[in-house]
Amino acid sequence: MEKVQQTIRAARGTELQTKGWVQEAALRMLMNNLDPEVAEKPEELVVYGGIGRAARNWESYHAIVDSLKTLENDETLLVQSGKPVAIFKSHEDAPRVLLANSNLVPKWANWDHFRELEKKGLMMYGQMTAGSWIYIGTQGILQGTYETFGEAARQHFDGSLKGTVTITAGLGGMGGAQPLAVTMNGGVVIAIDVDKRSIDRRIEKRYCDKYTESLEEALAIANEYKEKKEPISIGLLGNAAEILPELVNRNIIPDLVTDQTSAHDPLNGYIPVGYTVEEAAKLREEDPERYVQLSKESMKKHVEAMLAMQEKGAITFDYGNNIRQVAFDEGLKNAFDFPGFVPAFIRPLFCEGKGPFRWVALSGDPEDIYKTDEVILREFADNEHLCNWIRMARQQVEFQGLPSRICWLGYGERAKFGRIINEMVANGELSAPIVIGRDHLDCGSVASPNRETESMKDGSDAVADWPILNALINSVNGASWVSVHHGGGVGMGYSLHAGMVIVADGTEAAAKRIERVLTSDPGMGVVRHVDAGYDLAVQTAKEKGVNIPMMK
């Protein structure tokens, strides 16, 4: 697609360019997704995750902007794979935007067919929060990554990663959270990436501490800090599919090993062994079929090394990029011998309706976020783990684009927080409305058998009714915009998922919508896990009064 060099930045303050705050919020969040501080390749409309875009092409982007500027308070804009296709009369409590991105009929749900359609200009890849306009930069995945490594520490290392070394790879928009998440848990991490720009970006934003091109130097620093039991993160330039086998050959085994390279997309994401970023780009253009095959062969080597490390005692887990599936398809029959991060560490949180809840200050004023931090510290003071997160985030997380915050809140907590935020906007404590949203990676909004719904207790991993029901209930309850996507995180054919965003503009109507949406949305997570037979979900549903007709 054509590259357009222009700097897009969301407006700040209280002056509207649209006919209402919900439309304004959608416009600012679309533009914020493409802010150079936030997006990975804004000139190509790519936000994160290989080719995860905010709009299909530049013509569609400008048409969306124009549509949002003229959209009435009782109209709904429909967006099909990043292209605005209709505006219908609806009503004031309806979503202002409905988005469907990258969805394919199952028999045709593969990368080859997607790329044919993309080439014809008929489709785009929306990832999760790229095409649904609620990406907030690397902070968006940071607490989830912090929670994952924290749970690994609780299960295997007496509650802290002090004195441990983690080896991982992939420092893009998602994987870039890993170095800081490990050091927040007290550990040492060597994070590998083949693209120097990705490492530089994480260092610039204080997500990573040091840069090196030398494996020897990385190991020396890691060992020094491991001995001192002090945290440090080292960005190592190289290809994990070369470096991990080399470590296995030398019998250098880390305490933990995982991976967040863009393995979900063998063509536009992963870079094969032996190629620089520039050489890979040339091969991708000249011979895409050979590129994909080389990528898949490299992924197989990568997973073989992870399995070898697991055999030698490393705590090993898949971080949701579908690399095990590719290795399995390439003939590595034991590729799934190490678990995914959700069944290993996160599912109990999902059973309580917990997930990555985020909010953004449309004012552009960091003080608005700091005031909301104080709300969390006051209202949820009994949750020491959550409060520790907020305190660390304030100190260590640099905002990208509009100021924002993320934390994991559960059923009941999200609605309570939303009510308070809306009241703060109403009484002027906050200088402009707040956008409340979440990742599609949530407790009740995704079907992804190699990630969020891997190894479900009842075998319902591939049942995709749940994200559809999630989107439907959020729409009728008045979310500001709702999205249904395919292929996020793990690639074409492997996931369906839904997103929602709601705007706290201080009005009484918003208060009612917030109460409904922020109850039903996490409620779907509780319901989904009750249905699968999880005792903790049943206990949560009974304690919180979630109405589930056939619950025993």
Swiss-Prot record:
Cofactor binding note from Swiss-Prot or TrEMBL: Binds 1 NAD(+) per subunit.
PROSITE patterns: UROCANASE (PS01233)
Pathway(s) per entry: Amino-acid degradation; L-histidine degradation into L-glutamate; N-formimidoyl-L-glutamate from L-histidine: step 2/3
GO CC terms: cytoplasm
Alphabetic keyword roster: Cytoplasm, Histidine metabolism, Lyase, NAD
Cofactors named for this entry: NAD(+)
GO molecular function, one term: urocanate hydratase activity
Catalytic activity entry: 4-imidazolone-5-propanoate = trans-urocanate + H2O
Record: residues binding NAD(+): 49-50, 127, 173-175, 193, 239-240, 260-264, 270-271, 319, 489
Subcellular location: Cytoplasm
Superkingdom assignment: Bacteria
InterPro entries: Urocanase (IPR055351), Urocanase-like (IPR023637), Urocanase_C (IPR035401), Urocanase_central_sf (IPR038364), Urocanase_CS (IPR023636), Urocanase_N (IPR035400), Urocanase_Rossmann-like (IPR035085), Urocanase_sf (IPR036190)
Membrane-spanning residues: none
GO biological process: L-histidine catabolic process to glutamate and formamide; L-histidine catabolic process to glutamate and formate
Positions of the catalytic residues: 407
EC numbers, comma separated: 4.2.1.49
SUPFAM superfamilies from the UniProt entry: Urocanase
HAMAP family: HutU
Function of the molecule: Catalyzes the conversion of urocanate to 4-imidazolone-5-propionate.
Family: Belongs to the urocanase family.
Protein name, as recorded: Urocanate hydratase
Origin species: Bacillus mycoides (strain KBAB4)
Source taxonomy: Bacteria, Bacillati, Bacillota, Bacilli, Bacillales
Gene: hutU
